[in-house]
Amino acid sequence: MDLPTTVVRKYWTFTNPNRILHQSVNQTFDVRQFVFDNARLVNCVDGDGKVLHLNKGWLCATIMQHGEASAGAKTQQGFMSIDITGDGELQEHLFVRGGIVFNKSVSSVVGSSGPNESALLTMISENGNLQVTYVRHYLKNHGESSGGGGGCGAASTASAVCVSSLGGSGGTRDGPSAEEQQRRRQEQRHEERRKKSSSSAGGGGGGGASGGGGGGGSGGQHSSDSANGLLRDPRLMNRQKERRPPPSSENDGSPPLREAKRQKTTAQHEGHGGGGKNETEQQSGGAGGGGGGGSGRMSLPLDTSEAVAFLNYSSSSSAVSSSSNNHHHHHHHHNAVTDVAAGTDGALLLPIERGAVVSSPSSTSPSSLLSLPRPSSAHSAGETVQESEAAATAAAAGLMMMRRMRRAPAEAAEAPPQSEEENDSTTPVSNCRVPPNSQESAAPQPPRSPRFDDIIQSLTKMLNDCKEKRLCDLPLVSSRLLPETSGGTVVVNHSSVARTAAAVSTAGVGPPAVACPPLVTTGVVPSGSVAGVAPVAAAVETPAAPPRPVCEIKPYVVNPVVATAAAASNSSSSSSAPLPPPPPPPGGRRGRARNNTRGGGGGGGGGRNSRRQAASSSSSSSRRSRRRNNRHEDEDNDPLLRLSQVAGSGRRRGPSFLEDGLEIIDPSEEAAIAAASIAAFFDD
């Protein structure tokens, strides 16, 4: 049969409450005190109830929580007590122990002293209202056996006070059994959660929450202690996880910088290994027909898409010569004819076929004197070059001459003659055929830094193109300045150039003599000045309509050593037949003759005296006038420029752009200046 249950319910409502004290000692202890104008109590026991009104009074609530707020349990254990006074007397005294939850507006505690008793106490303070609710369930015989309510105050509150005292005494009497049951449940939950966390996250999972409320102070304390000792707060464990380093760096034990260095050294070892070749060596080896093990010399891949590819430190000619030492010559010869390598000077490639060069040591022609002389050897002393490959041969000769003059002039003279097959087995590097270098057939030489062979080759090709093609179309030898000879051609010659060319043709075995290529100048030389010298003449046809020269940006640089040497040779050659100054052409006056530097169309002799008189008479010596004077002095000292000025002074434009770094020059003067500079470079 079911035992009768008693249910006590109390509802307090306060009018015009005002909080006068709120003291929060820490997160687990809070005290609040209110004053009110009047209060109303609704007291119900089972099916009976009554209402009680109180006047002014105050209410004090104390909330205590055991353990830390972050212990991990769903509800913290603690207690809450509420004392109410009215009309100067104590009207109510409520106390409940159990699981507690509180915040700024709501405070509630639920307690259970055993299987036959439970209680709830809640206080709500929100929007100017204050309410207190108290509910308790217990057995009738349980309450009657614990004693009457004689010690209580008023009759209306006797049952509540007795119930509260009975709840406390019952909790102390029946506490051990309930605490043991709750402790076992919590231990089982902790065991299960510990197994789950260790299996899923390796002992780093989130801590579980110990649920369930228990009566008695010792039970609540034990649950909080076990939660703190066995399982930590999940937020703290996650924070420790974030501070750990990533597993990759933790396993390797090396920082990212050390790993990057390790990758770099590994790549270097693979590139210089005995059996492997990197990508650049494979590309250069495929172009030269080579193979085999990896070489120590690194050659950059040639790329024609780059306009400044000739500035690379390595040229494919060295890679070709080194690969030819390790292989048979006939195999390399086949690859050299069929493959066309990229030009290192950025120029497009022209395939070179066999039979273009015919060897004839005894024959020499004026067309061979138009290019720079090749290195003197038994096989290549003189070669007849077709007109289509004149520029390519001149560029190749300049390249080889530069290498011989720099490295070993003595060894170049004593080099043994090479076979025809080895001479022809060269890979076209640019638009020219490069003869084999005997110096690289020996032990591999250390890399030279940097090489300017490709730059010299490009400059030589530019000079040859300007000399062979462009000057033939320019109206520099027009009938406006020079009288035509029979047949409409003009004989243009220079005595010093002819002497140098004759000396080159008669040179023996030894260091190659370097000579400036014969220049097509604009001066008129009488036929008597070249008596006893092999004639080196060029028949130039003059077009009908003379166009104006092209404006080009060019630095004005003349080597004084070349100027003095050329001036000495010019003075010795012109002693027999001096050059008569031509009459000034009509309309040849300069447009801007500021300091009377070149008044009228005067020649180079009277310009210096007029400049000195103008410089002494002028009061202001500005920087512009000094620059112009220096320029004219350099022109007077240079025989090539003086010769061109004698014949072409009238073709000069009036404005001088030397202050701005610009100057309008004729292509013939440009070729003369560049040739003089290159000749001085070879002489040094």
Swiss-Prot record:
Residues 201-220, 285-296, 598-608 have a biased composition (Gly residues). It is found in: Host nucleus; Virion. Residues 180-191, 232-245, 258-272 have a biased composition (Basic and acidic residues). This is Early phosphoprotein p84. Residues 326-335 have a biased composition (Basic residues). Residues 166-301, 317-336, 357-393, 407-452, 569-657 are annotated as: Disordered. Residues 359-377, 612-622 have a biased composition (Low complexity). Needed for efficient replication. Recruits the DNA polymerase processivity factor to pre-replication foci. Residues 578-587 have a biased composition (Pro residues). Residues 425-442 have a biased composition (Polar residues). Signal peptide: none annotated. Keywords: Early protein, Host nucleus, Phosphoprotein, Virion. Isoforms 1, 2, 3 and 4 interacts with themselves and with each other via their shared N-terminal regions; these interactions are important to both their intranuclear targeting and the recruitment of UL44 to subnuclear sites for viral replication. Its main location: host cell. A motif (Nuclear localization signal) lies at residues 261-264. InterPro entries: U79_P34 (IPR004138). GO terms for cellular component: host cell nucleus; viral tegument. Belongs to the herpesviridae U79/UL112 family.
